[in-house]
Amino acid sequence: MAEITAQLVKELREKTGAGMMDCKKALKENEGDLEKSIEWLRQKGIASADKKSGRTAAEGLVHSYIHFGGRIGVLVEVNCETDFVARGDRFKDLVNDVAMQIAACPNVEYVSVADIPQEMVAKEKEIEMGRDDLGKKPANIKEKIVQGRIDKRLKELSLLDQPYIKDQNLTIEELVKQAIAELGENIQVRRFIRFNLGEGIEKAETNFAEEVAAAAKG
């Protein structure tokens, strides 16, 4: 396997316009082969998607999705650049897929890791640093373990980092980038809210056996 150097990453970025982390991942997946990495990025829609990421996306759809007999509901806003794309079936299918993903992911609270408040990140770090299993480890090792755990936790909260429910080999971010490549426009998941029936309502606890007995007495 070829060594994945900073120069190789830079060259791939210049050829594709993809982000640094995507380029590193592409090179790792393709054992440092530049041409295969370019093709890999194109197949995932990343190469063209990152070039469009700075363009204004002010059109789009607000979409609702109701699941499981009305027990779970989702509202999501996904933006694109033109009304023409927003009204097309490809974009509508993407928005519906994103809404279904949100319905299936009860732990997801933010669109991306970048949206998570810093105070929450700091709190997660404080919790992890205080865990008993890290007590005797050297400071540098402890820091790496803690950072790894925090990164994992933050990704659990991020919609874009979730494996796509219809294809576990894709993340939602990659799914969106594929649509960007196909439609030729910048597409952004802007915001969402998820409703669970009865969430936050304190329910009275009942004894099932007593309920049956009471019903039997008429």
UniProtKB/Swiss-Prot annotation:
Cystine pairs:
none
**What InterPro entries does the record point to?**
EF-Ts_dimer_sf, Transl_elong_EFTs/EF1B, Transl_elong_EFTs/EF1B_dimer, Transl_elong_Ts_CS, UBA-like_sf
Q: Which SUPFAM superfamilies match?
A: Elongation factor Ts (EF-Ts), dimerisation domain, UBA-like
* Keywords associated with the record: Cytoplasm, Elongation factor, Protein biosynthesis
Q: Where in the cell is it found?
A: Cytoplasm
Q: Which Pfam families match?
A: EF_TS
Q: Give the CC-aspect GO terms.
A: cytoplasm
Main location (coarse class): cytoplasm
Molecular function (GO) terms for this protein are: translation elongation factor activity
List every stretch annotated Involved in Mg(2+) ion dislocation from EF-Tu.
82-85
- Read off the NCBIfam families from this record: tsf (TIGR00116)
Q: What family does this chain come from, according to its entry? A: Belongs to the EF-Ts family.
* Function field: Associates with the EF-Tu.GDP complex and induces the exchange of GDP to GTP. It remains bound to the aminoacyl-tRNA.EF-Tu.GTP complex up to the GTP hydrolysis stage on the ribosome.
In Swiss-Prot or TrEMBL terms, this protein is called Elongation factor Ts
The species this protein belongs to is: Synechocystis sp. (strain ATCC 27184 / PCC 6803 / Kazusa)
